Curated annotation (Swiss-Prot):
It catalyses: a ubiquinone + NADH + 5 H(+)(in) = a ubiquinol + NAD(+) + 4 H(+)(out). It comes from Strongylocentrotus purpuratus (Purple sea urchin). The gene is ND5. This is NADH-ubiquinone oxidoreductase chain 5. Its main location: mitochondrion. Belongs to the complex I subunit 5 family. It is found in: Mitochondrion inner membrane. The keyword Mitochondrion applies.
Amino acid sequence: MVISPSLIISSLNLGILTILLGSIFFFSKSYFSKGNVNFPLIKTTSACLSVNNDKEETIEYNSGPFAMAILKVLAFLSVLSLLVTCNNSIQSINITLSLWLSNTPLNISLNFIYDQYFLVFLSVALIVTWSIMEFSFYYMTEDPNSSAFFRLLTIFLLNMLILTCSNSLFLIFLGWEGGGFLSFLLISWWTTRNDASSSALEAVITNRIGNIGLITFMALSALNFNSSNLTNILSSNENLTPLLPFLLFGLILAAAGKSAQFGLHPWLPALLEGPTPVSALLHSSTMVVAGVFLLVRTSELFSSPLITHSLVLILGGTTALFAASTAIAQHDIKKIIAYSTTSQLGLMVTAIGIGQPALAFFHICTHAFFKAMLFLCSGSVIHSLSDEQDLRKMGGLSKLLPVTSSCLILGSLALMAPLLAGFYSKDLILEATSASVLNLLGIVLSIVATMLTAVYSFRIIFFCFSLSPSCSSPFSHSEENFNLNNALLRLATGTIASGWFFSNLLFAPPSFNVTSLAKGTPLIVPIIGVAALFMSLISSTSNSIGSNAHSATTSQWFFVDAVHLSIITMSLALSFFSSRTLDRGWQENIGPQGIAPTSTALSKISQAGQIGLIKRYILSSMASVLVILALSLLILS
């Protein structure tokens, strides 16, 4: 009996999702039993035994090892599924579990699609999350609610996998909204911190704007095609002409909100108020790439209108340049990495704009490894420096934290050095932009942003390792914890090997007919950026710090100030208008100030008729009778 490869892939992936869903219910902090305790629990160093007043024996343990074991097994299963797909050249597998609503004008079914996009992303997401979960066991060891934290991380991953494997708009929206809700819970994990709560609220409100776009796309698709199946909607491309601008607007708005494009970007740096593992997971392989992944899934809609390509290209290039220029002026190490994420998301959107969705997805996969590693390295450094995050106070980390410092250098070089993960995908995107005949402005913005990427990447290396430490706090943590080292080394392996592996075994990189100068652009641009950094460091003086360019980049192009000022100005203008037109205008004249004059005038009219003349009484009576007769005749006729 020969087993079909499609059946193997479907079974493995459904099993992965089912096990991941079932594992959520086992993240419990304690178990209770009468008498002897014979539960087959995972033994950890944090396990303890206590007896309460009812003589119930309670075992409390940290569920971190259980979460790591589950994700480890699922990661190996996902890699096995990916290898089966590669060996059999399977394009996609569509699975319909059930028709949820079948007797309605809109048929809603639970559809899953297992294609190359999902299978590659599944392996990357599970490996990265496994590493982050292992790091969390080291980082959150003193948190009393660590079991709930592991549960939320797992649910968050599950929502992202539902989003990426769904072929139904209903399930896509479920994963989309689930990721947003879980991000609120994770960012505000330390609920006693006002900054964490306000940052979580900012992220939710900003994502609501993006949700308007996704709901617009879903509503128009449902009304015109009576189907929630994404493949059916995309295959009806010839019937989309009247609706295409509105559908594209919805998709671009949704992606801009979820992937923090320029204009809706301030929520992404706000994620840093949560624990470092949350920042690593959100910035690498889950929530922030959901918008770009949605554009990759629906890239067929972007094939015809060139103006849409230009708009997306300019949006991505502006985002990349804005974030890169802001990152070079930051001093908080986590903020530099956060703005680096925004810049790389802009580069992914640029790839969509030039009609290369496969390159955007390629960059998603390579970016996940080194970005997660950079955040974990920053968390290790911050722990070791007693919560110090200022880049200027660091230095000499190579002797104090050899593993962390090596991984931090590797992650910083991944965006600019050849033969590392980020360079493979970024090289192809820049080469594709050079060969593009679309908007020149977006292409120039992307190239300048890439040069600035080398600046802030090398700036991290320079301040952390070339200088002597100026932090007075003692180094209270070391690298003896194997959970920290294992997580970093696993991600370092992915940073080194993923670019070559994906480009040679999974993706077929397109070839572009470009000049030798354009071919060497990905190598020339980082060198120019590093040279500019050294020149600025050599010639920098205390008087040059107050320059206009430095003020603009430090203040994020004054975007936040402009938005806040516009909101305040608009509120004051509306208040002034309300005060003049309502409180001190017609409402005041009609209401409080108008009742007395109106009553006086009516009283005078009434008094004028009460002067004691009989002829006036008879005249008013006759007039009343005539009016009544006229109304009666009018009604009867």
